[in-house]
Amino acid sequence: MISRMEKMTMMMKILIMFALGMNYWSCSGFPVYDYDPSSLRDALSASVVKVNSQSLSPYLFRAFRSSLKRVEVLDENNLVMNLEFSIRETTCRKDSGEDPATCAFQRDYYVSTAVCRSTVKVSAQQVQGVHARCSWSSSTSESYSSEEMIFGDMLGSHKWRNNYLFGLISDESISEQFYDRSLGIMRRVLPPGNRRYPNHRHRARINTDFE
């Protein structure tokens, strides 16, 4: 049986070896970067700003859950942060000039929610560049699934709206989808003799040119 004293001696040796090993790595050129926690907050804030600049939603998005996935140290003053965060539409409109962090979340059942990932370059404690991309969370998809099963093509896929909010589908394409879907519903619901199709020549066109 190993006595208590021997156990304590063994633990002390392990701790000393661990401390010496850490000291060896730091002295041998292993990158050590003690960044300010405010840099993480700035990186998240810059990521949300980037998402809002890319979104076509009239409302601002706000982060409500975030985590730091990885930190890549480039040198003493430069690093790259990989963040993952969830966003949700707020009650503040884009043209309000409000800080998204101060805006209340929308409480609508169909409020848009997404999971985003961003890569943020930080130099001398300042954000220098941000790349962000988002995908719609499973909870958002599930909230639509039951309605789609009940109403079918009357609701259609929710993906068109989600893609529109992040600029993946133009206004004109959305108009085409609504028009084609309405024709499909009329063909199934109305008898052949009672069908009255909208006049193609009088359909409004939406200007999709952006500055």
From Swiss-Prot:
Its main location: secreted. Residues 1-29 form the signal peptide. One of its GO terms (biological process) is bone remodeling. Disulfide bonds join C92-C103, C116-C134. Phosphorylation sites are present in the extracellular medium. The keyword Hydrolase does not apply. It holds the Pfam family Spp-24. Keywords: Disulfide bond, Phosphoprotein, Secreted, Signal. It is found in: Secreted. InterPro entries: Cystatin_sf, Spp-24. The modification Phosphoserine is found at S96, S145, S146, S170, S173, S182. Detected in liver and plasma. The keyword NAD does not apply. SUPFAM superfamilies: Cystatin/monellin. GO terms for molecular function: endopeptidase inhibitor activity. One of its GO terms (cellular component) is extracellular region. Belongs to the SPP2 family. Could coordinate an aspect of bone turnover. This is Secreted phosphoprotein 24. It comes from Homo sapiens (Human).
